[in-house]
From Swiss-Prot:
It comes from Serratia proteamaculans (strain 568). It is found in: Cytoplasm. The keyword Cytoplasm applies. Keywords: 4Fe-4S, Cytoplasm, Iron, Iron-sulfur, Metal-binding, S-adenosyl-L-methionine, Transferase. Its EC number is 2.8.1.8. This is Lipoyl synthase. InterPro entries: Aldolase_TIM, Elp3/MiaA/NifB-like_rSAM, LIAS_N, Lipoyl_synth, rSAM. It is an enzyme of class 2 (transferase). Its main location: cytoplasm. The gene is lipA. It comes from the Bacteria. Pathway: Protein modification; protein lipoylation via endogenous pathway; protein N(6)-(lipoyl)lysine from octanoyl-[acyl-carrier-protein]: step 2/2.
Length: 321
């Protein structure tokens, strides 16, 4: 019997090293390896990368992280070129090891107590009017990182009084009561928590997470803050069916969620879960029609949509795909 891997604190485990730590193994078949991206999945890079390099430099200068870079988001060039970014707090090492995600796994260091102030100043320097704050999972913290979220929100608003803040939070596994109590003190303008996919594939796609728990988190926040929109998103192409996606949409509406994002899953590396199918733009349009008919006030559905992709436009109800 092989010895368990001894993880060093502060070390990022990625790709094969990360996947080796997952109890439900990822099996890539020859057919899946041959699945090629269709034409609609091709990305055009901007000719001028000056703004992109400027945002990266600002992040490095202040020791901040963006989920855009850490999760290898396909929209990084477009978003950075438009002067927008999704800030990732609580470090760049996640205590979970989801096989669809490119964020590093490991034993994270203690949260940076100066991060809220550095984040607030960076946002002020960039002149942003709408920001998305997300984080890695921090199962090592007694509140799951909720107090750090609250501190960041308070610091950002102190320096940027008119700004709109969207939080994309983890599930606060085992700590929901405490986390919601803390977030009640400084709630965001939009509360986002992603279900990621349908319950049938959770054991493989989101090991360590629970579908019903995530729905309950969204519902309880909405009950405490009925005036604040709640939002959730799914990746498609991981073995689910369109009928299952529609059922998840119904579950979200039953739990008070009014904003939805649906986007195509893309395999970050050959070590991650393979793409099972590519969903066409026409299918995404049909899903959006279904969502709006169910009563969602906002539904961004398209191949490149991510939960924070043009989040400011999503919040205004403008079409994003």
């Amino acid at each position: 019997m092989s010895k368990p891997i001894q993880m060093e604190r502060g070390v990022k485990y990625r790709d094969a090293d990360k996947m080796a730590l997952i109890p439900v193994k990822t099996v890539v078949t020859e057919r899946q390896e041959l699945l090629r991206k269709p034409e609609w999945m091709k990305i055009k890079l901007p000719a001028d990368s000056t703004r992109i390099q400027g945002i990266k430099a600002a992040m490095r200068k202040n020791g901040l992280h963006s989920v855009c870079e850490e999760a290898s988001c396909p929209n990084l060039s477009e978003c950075f070129n438009h002067g927008t970014a999704t800030f990732m707090i609580l470090g760049a090492i996640c205590t979970r090891r989801c096989p669809f995600c490119d964020v590093a796994h490991g034993r994270p260091v203690a949260p940076d107590a100066n991060e809220p102030e550095k984040l607030a100043q960076t946002i002020a320097d960039m002149g942003l009017r709408y920001v998305v704050i997300t984080s890695v999972d921090r199962d090592d913290l007694r509140d799951g990182g909720a107090q750090h979220f609250a501190d960041c929100i308070a610091a950002i608003r102190a320096k940027n009084p008119t700004i709109k803040i969207e939080t994309l939070v983890p599930d606060f596994r085992g700590r929901m009561d405490r986390a919601l109590e803390i977030l009640t003190e400084t709630p965001p303008d939009v509360f986002n928590h992603n279900l990621e996919n349908v319950p049938r594939v959770y054991r493989q796609v989101r090991p360590g997470a629970n579908y019903e728990w995530s729905l309950k988190l969204l519902e309880r926040f909405k009950e405490a803050h009925p005036h604040i929109p709640t939002k959730s998103g799914l990746m498609v192409g991981l073995g689910e069916t369109n009928a299952e996606i529609v059922e998840v949409m119904r579950d979200l509406r039953r739990h008070g969620v009014t904003m939805l994002t649906l986007g195509q899953y893309l395999q970050p590396s050959r070590h991650h879960l393979p793409v099972q199918r590519y969903v066409s733009p026409a299918e995404f349009d049909e899903m959006k029609e279904e969502a709006m008919a169910m009563g969602f006030t906002h539904a961004a559905c398209g191949p490149f949509v991510r939960s924070s992709y043009h989040a400011d436009l999503q919040a205004k109800g403008m079409e994003v795909k």
